[in-house]
From Swiss-Prot:
Pathway in which this enzyme or protein is active: Isoprenoid biosynthesis; isopentenyl diphosphate biosynthesis via DXP pathway; isopentenyl diphosphate from 1-deoxy-D-xylulose 5-phosphate: step 3/6
Catalysis: reaction(s): 4-CDP-2-C-methyl-D-erythritol + ATP = 4-CDP-2-C-methyl-D-erythritol 2-phosphate + ADP + H(+)
Encoding gene per record: ispE
Protein's name in the database: 4-diphosphocytidyl-2-C-methyl-D-erythritol kinase
Gene3D superfamilies (alphabetical): 3.30.230.10, GHMP kinase, C-terminal domain (3.30.70.890)
Organism: Shewanella baltica (strain OS155 / ATCC BAA-1091)
Length: 284
């Protein structure tokens, strides 16, 4: 009897509510302090367990499947190798999040793959063990595996659960691809923001140390942020290109979205301190 498809595994986007760069480490990575919060806008994945070890990926987004270095496939392969599981999976990705915009979609897809297949393959790794696999694939992946809003330090892997307010956001995705590597290699990037205690950081105005540099180099980001600042406190997430404005009411965010210039793409989403992936785990 063929295996059933396990459907509707969410891979939520994240926002960096602040992002501070505290210096460059000896290994070349940057020391960061950042605050992650999920939003209720997600990619969706379906999985079918197979008896043979092949890993097959389908997607509604052209170009995703052709990439053999795809994080979804690398995550599944890493779980196979770590556990010795000799079966495989067929995976369907419904890509809804903008790619390469600082929303963490690729990392979230990989995290959902690890969490879902760990359950469906009955490999029984702990959350910490899954996070260790994820960290080898990308610094953002552990926060999606743990599934709670978090203050992060190091390269982003040391996590402390936090409970910020859950406002509504208007997220704009400018028509620009910002290379994270280029941003972190740029000599003009500020790298000397002092490390502060979490209580201090949570109580002061929030900022993104990458924003000034990216805005200066990408006019599309500058234009989107300038427009959004007329309606709400706004800043960039990650290394961009996406920017977000914060609203207390959904209706306020929707009213601003209705005025969005036709050349810009945007959506309204609510902040979530608990990932919908954790909720999905409790279902068959």
């Amino acid at each position: 009897m063929p295996a059933a498809i396990s459907r509707n595994w969410p891979a939520p986007a994240k926002l960096n509510l602040f992002l501070h760069i505290n210096g460059r480490r000896a290994d070349g990575y940057h020391a960061l302090q950042t605050l992650f919060q999920f939003i209720d806008c997600c990619d969706m994945l379906d999985f079918k367990v197979t008896e043979t070890p092949e890993l097959i990926l389908h997607s509604n987004m052209s170009g995703v499947v052709a990439d053999s270095d795809n994080l979804i496939l690398r995550a599944a392969k890493s779980l196979q190798q770590t556990t010795g599981f000799n079966g495989g999976a067929e995976i369907w990705l419904d890509k809804r999040l903008p790619m390469g915009g600082g929303l963490g979609g690729g990392s979230s897809d990989a995290a959902t793959t690890l969490v879902a297949l760990n359950k469906l393959w009955h490999t029984q790794l702990s959350t910490e063990e899954l996070a260790k696999i994820g960290l080898k694939l990308g610094a953002d992946i552990p926060v999606f595996i743990h599934g709670f809003a978090a203050f992060a330090e190091g390269v982003g892997e040391r996590l402390q659960a936090v409970n910020p307010s859950e406002p509504w956001y208007l997220v704009i995705a400018p028509d620009a691809h910002v290379s994270t590597a280029d941003v972190f290699q740029d000599p003009l990037l500020p790298r000397e923001t002092p490390k502060l205690a979490i209580d201090t950081l949570m109580s002061q105005p929030w900022a993104n140390d990458c924003q000034k540099l990216v805005v200066s180099k990408y006019p599309q980001v500058a234009k989107a942020l300038g427009w959004l600042l007329e309606y709400a406190p706004s800043r960039m997430t990650g290394t961009g290109a996406c920017v977000f404005g914060e609203f207390t009411q959904q209706q306020q965010a929707l009213a601003a979205l209705a005025k969005l210039p036709s050349e810009m793409q945007g959506f309204v989403a609510q902040g979530m301190n608990l990932s919908p992936l954790i909720t999905r785990l409790s279902h068959p």
